[in-house]
Amino acid sequence: MALLELKNINKFFGKVQAVNGVNFEVKQSEVLALLGDNGAGKSTLAKIISGVYAPSSGEIYFDGELMTKWDVQSARSKGIETVYQDRALAEQQSIASNIFIGRELSGSMSMGFINLKKQYEEADNLMREIGLTSQAFNAKTPLLTLSGGELQGIAIARAFYFKARLVILDEPVTSLSLNESEKVYNFIDKVKREGLSCILICHNIYQAYDTADRFVVLDRGRNVLNVEKKDLSAQQLIDSMREIAHSAHT
């Protein structure tokens, strides 16, 4: 059974149709690469999946259940987290505030203190595992002191920290060095083996091919290709995307 399934998803902004009859599914422990030119509808579709936008029509299934209500709260309750290109961080706040944002500690004050200390330790370990911060983790460290790569690390850590079932990564390594990017993709491979699913939006087709198990290509809001990695080579994927881009301009 698919973890997430989209059936005939459409999204209009006024008279403009940004997503047109999209169908695909994401399986457990699968990385799906969502590819396409700028304006193809990738980010809009990601925001539909994460609950930021409601689809104009179509059906969303999670664990085989039809989601009759779909918003950010519904998506998060199902274990869907997102890392956007702009990171959506509160840069006036601390590292801890951003990683734990939107979550409440449970229990008494004494138990809360213990939980908070444990969360700091777990978040520290996660940041070190991803390898994106050069600073020792400190709950009070303000984001204003961090580099672009470190900020991206915080955004990624926040998504993975709460043991999400599906993480949407929208251009997750745009501001990172090659070394930092490699660490992120290695981490994605690790959590996939542990059962987590990912939707990866990126422009680097070779990196997408190395990381993903399945590829969905969008063109003007439509999914025009849906194929597993075992069924084509990286060069065949590139050639297919070139043909799609050429047909879009003829």
Residue ranges of each PLM-predicted region?
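Glycine-rich phosphate-binding loops of nucleotide-dependent enzymes
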Residues: 2-250
